């Protein structure tokens, strides 16, 4: 990758700039008190976090819709923990979670400072598989919104990363060719491989070090983007 030819950077949001797991835990902490959920939060999260990842994969692959994602990711966790939760409670909790989540705005360390540095040299864009209304509030409340020229979300395009269509759409609205753009995200499949498949460059953000490193460009901290850009 020759950085002199790069004009635009495309970021993922959740797990890349916006610390999803930390903010999600804070949201559930609030909701467990509000709804008087009789479970220890850490025990719930131990099951919920990988379960949520699995359900998001199904959603990304088009095997379930948004409503099933929101309901099933909670229902299955309560079932595994043998906690009696009515459908009414689960639906109410699912809706409240979506409303509460954007109220917490923890970003990964260095997020704002690296965006400040990069915006002087590149056009910054966002590509996200998250729900449009929720993602907008996350970006607004966390101070990320002013840094990005365009935001491409899967609900507006009708395709989710790693589908080539969402990348090509984002490149078109950003006014750049694939060879002039870099995708930065935490998902090897959705962000890195999806971008590479349309001719973009890609950098894999992995704040949790993996035992088996890949052959892709990788960073563990956002500030390390300056090594490549």
Placement of each model-derived feature along the sequence:
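Glycine-centered short loops/turns at secondary-structure junctions
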Residues: 121-122, 199
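Asp-based, Mg2+/Mn2+-dependent phosphohydrolase catalytic module
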Residues: 1-9, 22, 88, 112, ...
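N-terminal helical cap/lid subdomain that shapes the substrate entry/recognition surface
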Residues: 3-13, 17-109
């Amino acid at each position: 990758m020759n950085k002199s030819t790069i004009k635009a950077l495309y970021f993922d949001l959740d797990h890349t700039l916006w610390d999803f797991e930390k903010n999600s835990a804070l949201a559930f902490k609030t909701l467990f008190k509000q709804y008087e959920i009789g479970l220890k939060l850490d025990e719930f999260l131990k099951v919920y976090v990988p379960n949520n990842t699995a359900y998001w994969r199904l959603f990304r692959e088009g095997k379930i819709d948004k409503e099933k994602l929101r309901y099933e990711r909670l229902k299955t966790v309560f079932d595994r923990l043998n906690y009696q939760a009515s459908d009414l409670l689960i639906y109410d909790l699912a809706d409240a979670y979506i409303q509460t989540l954007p109220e917490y705005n923890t970003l990964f360390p260095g997020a704002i400072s690296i965006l400040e540095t990069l915006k002087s040299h590149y056009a910054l864009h966002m590509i996200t598989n998250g729900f449009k209304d929720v993602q907008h509030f996350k970006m607004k409340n966390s101070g990320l919104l002013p840094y990005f020229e365009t935001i491409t979300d899967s609900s507006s395009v009708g395709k989710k990363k790693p589908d080539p269509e969402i990348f090509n759409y984002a490149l078109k609205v950003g006014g750049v060719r694939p060879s002039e753009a870099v995708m930065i995200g935490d998902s090897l499949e959705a962000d890195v491989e999806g971008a590479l498949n349309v001719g973009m460059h890609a950098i894999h953000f992995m704040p949790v070090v993996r035992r088996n490193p890949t052959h892709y460009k990788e960073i563990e901290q956002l500030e390390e983007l300056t090594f490549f850009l």
